[in-house]
Amino acid sequence: MEPLDTLNLWMERARDRARAISFGRFLWHRFLDDRLFQAAAALAYTTVFALVPLAIVVFGVLSAFPVFDRWSDQLSDYVFSNFVPNAARAAEGYLRQFSASAGQLTAAGFIALVVSLLITLNSVEETFNQIWRVGSTRPKLTRFLVYWTVLTLGAMLAAASLAVSARVFAMPLFGTQEGRWLAELALRLAPILIEFVCITLMFRVVPHHTVKWRHAVPGAILAAVILELVKWGIGAYLGSFQSYQKLYGTVAFVPILLLWIYLCWVAVLLGASLSSSMAAFRYQPVELRLPQGYEFYGLLRLLGRFHHARAKGKGLADDEILRLEPMLTDSLLQDLACNLQEIGLLRRDERGEWLLSRDLDQVSLADLYECTQLRIPVAEQHLPYRDDSLGRAALAALDDLRLPLRERLKRKVSDIYTDSGDMP
């Protein structure tokens, strides 16, 4: 889908008042469920311990390639000049000193630094998986390869972009007045564009979930805007409140850096929550909503879809499942899929599609009941799609469970104690 088509689609949906209100409520509940501010605090804490290992890895990668080594100082200066408050610039010197002393580390010290970096990256992935409601994680080796690729390629691409930019801005075109104005505009917009691109790629790569561009881009825009507002707010506050330097002295950069890291994670996680909400939101008219307590009916329909897909030799992606079964929400689908994965009934392939990994004749209703812990509904409710072939089959199986139970539940509680005799 083209970006313009996506924009028109969302504008059309925004004009639907019921849909807009429903999405607003859904987004608010997702914000609360994700506990973003607590997650940002945890990530900020682990990030502080990973700053030195991260600097060692980045500068170590650049120094390994002579063509990039001479750009490491410019890269460090550019990052701290454009993405970190001026009050925290002192951290740059300390990180450079620690990186220069990395060669004096013992094997145990180097391993400890690498472990702290991997813990931080693993925490980021776990937080993103939680936001996207992903119950499974990548294999450990795959995770390590992804982390290492992001760190090494990210450092080299950043240095390469600086080298290309310097070569481009040295062209005669930028020696004219119009060229200088264009160069100044590009330099002003570059930090925002870099933030936007990095966050978009983060949303696409980090979660163990297929995130579409049309969902990642709006979340990245929100995160980049919040980051710019945070930078402006911190600069305005510190510019009007100078006593913090007298209070903290030479370590004044420490609380500023901690606050900045925390607010950066808040911005990124808010954008991630918006992206996941846009992907998960399904507007359901009242007549198509699955009644509360009838999730078992949805489970039986879901397994029917997998049974038919397996007969055709294919799997089902999340989007296709939600299209086939619009009564299911994304959260319910992820919960059911994770429960079925735990008992080895489902597995996810390398393309992110779900596949049946066992024959259904090897699975009983008791197995489904035990692994999902879903209730067996008793009351009568209008069920969506009950008249199609899949609905009739699922409802018949559900009636075999609930109708005898309904008769049993008509028993009076007092009958339980009629023949119990005297209490001890």
UniProtKB/Swiss-Prot annotation:
Record field: transmembrane: 48-68, 101-121, 144-164, 181-201, 216-236, 251-271
InterPro entries xref list: UPF0761_bac, Virul_fac_BrkB
Record GO cellular component, one term: plasma membrane
UniProt keyword Cell membrane present: yes
Matching Pfam families: Virul_fac_BrkB
Source superkingdom: Bacteria
Topology term for the membrane: Multi-pass membrane protein
Coiled-coil annotated spans: none
Intracellular or extracellular location(s): Cell inner membrane
Key words, A-Z: Cell inner membrane, Cell membrane, Membrane, Transmembrane, Transmembrane helix
Primary location group: membrane
Membrane found in the keyword field: yes
PANTHER family documented for this protein: INNER MEMBRANE PROTEIN YHJD, UPF0761 MEMBRANE PROTEIN YIHY
Family: Belongs to the UPF0761 family.
Name by which UniProt lists this protein: UPF0761 membrane protein Smlt0865
Organism for this UniProt entry: Stenotrophomonas maltophilia (strain K279a)
Organism lineage: Bacteria, Pseudomonadati, Pseudomonadota, Gammaproteobacteria, Lysobacterales
